[in-house]
Amino acid sequence: MSRVPDNLYYTKSHEWFLIENGVATVGITDYAQHQLTDIVYVDFPKNGEHKNKGETLLTIESVKSAEDVYSPVTGEIIEINRDLESKPELINEDPYKNWLVKIRLSNDNFDGMSGEEYKKYIGE
């Protein structure tokens, strides 16, 4: 079974996000990293880039496939988890500790599933 922390929001495309002080921390779920298997590369956007909710945020490559990660919010990328540039496999070890990007919200237009809703969505 996948780990699904209760304090986060989740999307149908398997991103998680946490909103604190107008900033969203974004990552992929445990379910997603299991589906991808061994992650070998993350193609990050640039700091300062603006992303709209639902737009491709970045791409994660694994030994199995390459998958887009979508922005769950609208705003400006203010931080990238640089540790993942040299060690993308950290996402497999703990996808919640090893977040991908932080985005300063430009509006309050976000919605997400609760942990319980996400567990039902993935059938766990």
From Swiss-Prot:
Its cofactor is (R)-lipoate. Transmembrane segments: none annotated. The modification N6-lipoyllysine is found at residue 64. It holds the Pfam family GCV_H. Keywords: Lipoyl. One of its GO terms (cellular component) is glycine cleavage complex. InterPro entries: Biotin_lipoyl, GCV_H, GCV_H/Fam206, GCV_H_sub, Single_hybrid_motif. One of its GO terms (biological process) is glycine decarboxylation via glycine cleavage system. Residues 23-104 form the Lipoyl-binding domain. The keyword Zinc-finger does not apply. SUPFAM superfamilies: Single hybrid motif. Binds 1 lipoyl cofactor covalently. PANTHER family: GLYCINE CLEAVAGE SYSTEM H PROTEIN (PTHR11715), GLYCINE CLEAVAGE SYSTEM H PROTEIN-RELATED (PTHR11715:SF3). The glycine cleavage system catalyzes the degradation of glycine. The H protein shuttles the methylamine group of glycine from the P protein to the T protein. Belongs to the GcvH family. The glycine cleavage system is composed of four proteins: P, T, L and H. This is Probable glycine cleavage system H protein. It comes from Picrophilus torridus (strain ATCC 700027 / DSM 9790 / JCM 10055 / NBRC 100828 / KAW 2/3). The lineage of its organism: Archaea, Methanobacteriati, Thermoplasmatota, Thermoplasmata, Thermoplasmatales.
